[in-house]
Amino acid sequence: RYWPVIPVVDPNGFYTVESKIYQLTEGGRYKSQKDVMAHQLAFIVEPIKDWKINVELNYRSNYNFDHTDYQTVYGYDVSKNPYIIANQTSSVTEYAYKSNFFNPNIFTEYGKSLESGHNFKVMLGFQSELFKQRDITASQDGIMSEVATLNTTQTNAQNRGGYSEWATAGFFGRVNYDYK
């Protein structure tokens, strides 16, 4: 309710329009499900002495599903006749989103220290990122049953969606030398 001075019900026993109770209880629903899955794998291999291979793999996926339905909300006048106070037309909207992110980081290094005091180290590596996403939205007006789904609506169908992706890749290297 807005303020404590606004009455909850009118003299006929209906909720008052000003209390917004009808809009809250009968105006529709919003439901959202979000799932995030992340995996990481990292290991170091030393196939021969002083040569190390580092591997790091990262993967993340996001899934999002939203459901929104707007129901026509009625208030009642002093003669107990209904009139629309919110959502002239009932409607349902469904939204789905998915994204995937993959990031490998692989590098190898070899180091050798000689008894004469010379130290050598070589590193080579690769790093990349790949991100893909897609979404789709569908909506329709005129809910015909108690079950608010796209299949139970009748007019003004709309849909939209899209895909996008980007990627990067890079190679790197380094040579180090020092003496004693």
Regions found by a protein language model. Give the residues of each.
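An active-site-proximal structural segment forming one wall of the substrate-binding cleft
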Residues: 51
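Transmembrane beta-barrel domains of outer membrane proteins
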Residues: 42-44, 56, 109-111, 174-178
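Surface-exposed loop/interface segments of Gram-negative outer-membrane beta-barrel transport/assembly proteins
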Residues: 1-36, 54-56, 60-170
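Outer-membrane beta-barrel channels and translocator barrels
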Residues: 46-48, 113-117, 180
